[in-house]
Amino acid sequence: RVLIVKVSSLGDVIHTLPAVTDAQRARKDIQFDWVIEENFAEVPSWHPAVENVIPVALRRWRRNIFKTYMNHEFRAFKRELQGVHYDLVIDAQGLIKSGFISRLSKGLTIGLSNRTIREPMATLFYNKVYSVPWTEHAVDRVRQLFSRALQYEYDPDEIDYGIDVSRIDASSSIGEKAGKQVVFLHGTTWKTKHWPEDYWRHLAHISTQAGYKVLVPWGTPEEKLRAESIAQGNERVEVLGKQTLSGLANYIQQSDGVIAVDTGLGHLAAALNKPTVSLYGPTNPGLSGTFGNNQLHLNSSLNCAPCVKKVCTYSGPGVTEEYAGSSFAVTPPCFASHGPIEVWQQFESLLGKS
């Protein structure tokens, strides 16, 4: 019996699923429990190898530590965590917070070495460590960690997230699909990762002219305003109501394909094996992009990308020859590389190959 500690974020959680599939295939007797942030607790339950999901509320608890202590919520979590003695505890995240949770549980703790994780101090909580190069994609890094900790081999060319769609919450049913549909995943974290709003509106027009209905989800008030702006004046664009992860998974599963920025929901689309065009400006998809079949990454051709910065510091003229002398009509300028017409052409091409 193995405990996985991977508490967040959505993309990181989804990156762990292929390793769970590998282990299940190699070790038929294996059973996983999983500690995860309460907002993402639906995801592990979709995998048949995960027996128990243990929600943790670190994000919420940090906002009021005194209240958390007084209402005994942390003590209840600790009691559940320590209710089982695990054969192995794998910290698949490599942060101090995940290392602390790993040590708090009962079992031999495993993690990545201090030279190969984001917060090296986390290794103080481990009994044993393994080194996996930073140059590997996040999915491969977790797969290697699991295979070495549990002593099995896997085929790196075969990728299976193992999601059983019948386990996705049936109460989030969305009805029958009517015609062709594409999902726009426009919401993300950093300002620099946002594709220009005008581009989304133009892309929505192209999509509906091609006979597609466009579905636009949102998660925050700011994202809702952007979704409504994308849909403005176009009856074939539907701004979805507030959804659970299960609801979003159902919409993605039912669609013909997805167009996304660098966002956790893009990784969900990849896990559901849905054709997805992902747009990358300041980030590097080679290390943490959508991973799997039917995935296409459109990277910026600016030579300052990927800068991995939350604030754009571009001041020109350090650009590739293709854009030398351009003033850039969009912000951030790295997204000038891929406009709506090209994105739609690439999307249709991907659908044709899938």
Residues covered by each model-derived region:
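Catalytic machinery of carbohydrate-active enzymes
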Residues: 1-354
